[in-house]
Amino acid sequence: MVQSAVTHFRPVMILAGGTGGHIFPGLAVAGVLRARGVPVVWLGAAGKMETHLVPKHGIEIQTIAVSGVRGHGMLALLGAPVRVLPAIFAAMRVLRRYRPRVVVSFGGFAAGPGGIAARLMGLPLIVHEQNRAPGMTNRVLARVARRVLSGFPGSFVAEEVVGNPVRKDIAALPAPGVRFAGRSGPVRLLVLGGSQGARVMNNALPVVLRVLSDSDVAVEVRHQCGEALRAETEGAYAYAGVAARVEPFISDMAAAYSWADLVVCRAGASTLAELCAAGVGSVLIPFPAAVDDHQRRNAEYLVAAGAALLLQQQDRAFYVYLESVLRDLLSNPMRRLAMAEAARGLAKSDAAECIAEIILKESI
């Protein structure tokens, strides 16, 4: 049931949108707050993902007309003040209506105008940055925020590292040593291309696994590829003569991580938080076009801890390196266990609860 705009308790207002990487952490924290009886209202950008996703969780959402300026050329940057000012005024109207006790930015198009409006109105502002390379919006808002929270160390000079929220069923998985104990049969390789798929993985994994079929190690493959690339991925495995379970989407990620001995995936902040919470080693292939190369920065944190290996898809020898890395890891259960335990050691599985506590402490 969607919450009413009129409530005895002043709500927490969440600013987040544009991508799942901003929205899902906000939803996780909203869930904790609502479980404690705290009303939540969302401010998003009109026509973006959040307008469809947030109401499905029973949370009221208000929208403002705003869009990004990065990557749209110099004219867009020069015209940014003209475009942003109306959005700030629109955000102020929403804030006056709801009178939130605190405003929390997880990033995205609406977060900039919403955060600036909050500070102009004297409302407490909290920023949570998911990536090691902060987005433009949170970089600006961090200068005026009351509290600056981060998912990884090194996002800001003055920060509180609280981690990125993950689903409770993933955080509740047994430790790697328990899961892997007595495991026999083929090595279980989980490939995650994301909801849109990752063509480089869809093309490379079948070829590399075909080459590795001459080894003594049997491999069982589960490959999540996105709906649009399903037929292409199935064809690539069939052409390579490699058996694989190809899926457009995996609904039970906790079960998938529990099943896996090793994961090959991108390096988005939420995915890495899940890898750590589950405790599973990984081969990370950052999306090279990610803004500010933030996926590579994210991946380097896990690599430094011994929890992952990093490969760059733009490297000319990418296929060779991928084959070498997989040949080593698939044949070395002790190294896989060490990586999994290192990942688990980085986990901050109570991130959503920690963020909610900070929000309540800063409420007015």
Swiss-Prot record:
Residue ranges of coiled coil: none
EC number of this enzyme: 2.4.1.227
Keywords: Cell cycle, Cell division, Cell inner membrane, Cell membrane, Cell shape, Cell wall biogenesis/degradation, Glycosyltransferase, Membrane, Peptidoglycan synthesis, Transferase
Binding site for UDP-N-acetyl-alpha-D-glucosamine: T19, G20, G21, N131, R167, S195, I250, Q295
Protein's membrane topology: Peripheral membrane protein
Pathway(s): Cell wall biogenesis; peptidoglycan biosynthesis
Main location: membrane
Catalyzed reaction equations: di-trans,octa-cis-undecaprenyl diphospho-N-acetyl-alpha-D-muramoyl-L-alanyl-D-glutamyl-meso-2,6-diaminopimeloyl-D-alanyl-D-alanine + UDP-N-acetyl-alpha-D-glucosamine = di-trans,octa-cis-undecaprenyl diphospho-[N-acetyl-alpha-D-glucosaminyl-(1->4)]-N-acetyl-alpha-D-muramoyl-L-alanyl-D-glutamyl-meso-2,6-diaminopimeloyl-D-alanyl-D-alanine + UDP + H(+)
Subcellular location field: Cell inner membrane
Gene3D superfamilies: Glycogen Phosphorylase B
Classification via InterPro entries: GlcNAc_MurG (IPR006009), Glyco_trans_28_C (IPR007235), GlycoTrans_28_N (IPR004276)
One of the protein's GO biological processes: lipid glycosylation
Primary enzyme class: transferase
A GO MF label: UDP-N-acetyl-D-glucosamine:N-acetylmuramoyl-L-alanyl-D-glutamyl-meso-2,6-diaminopimelyl-D-alanyl-D-alanine-diphosphoundecaprenol 4-beta-N-acetylglucosaminlytransferase activity
GO cellular component: plasma membrane
Function: Cell wall formation. Catalyzes the transfer of a GlcNAc subunit on undecaprenyl-pyrophosphoryl-MurNAc-pentapeptide (lipid intermediate I) to form undecaprenyl-pyrophosphoryl-MurNAc-(pentapeptide)GlcNAc (lipid intermediate II).
Family: Belongs to the glycosyltransferase 28 family. MurG subfamily.
UniProt xrefs under HAMAP family: MurG (MF_00033)
Name of the protein described by the UniProt record: UDP-N-acetylglucosamine--N-acetylmuramyl-(pentapeptide) pyrophosphoryl-undecaprenol N-acetylglucosamine transferase
Upper taxonomic lineage: Bacteria, Pseudomonadati, Pseudomonadota, Gammaproteobacteria, Lysobacterales
Gene that produces this protein: murG
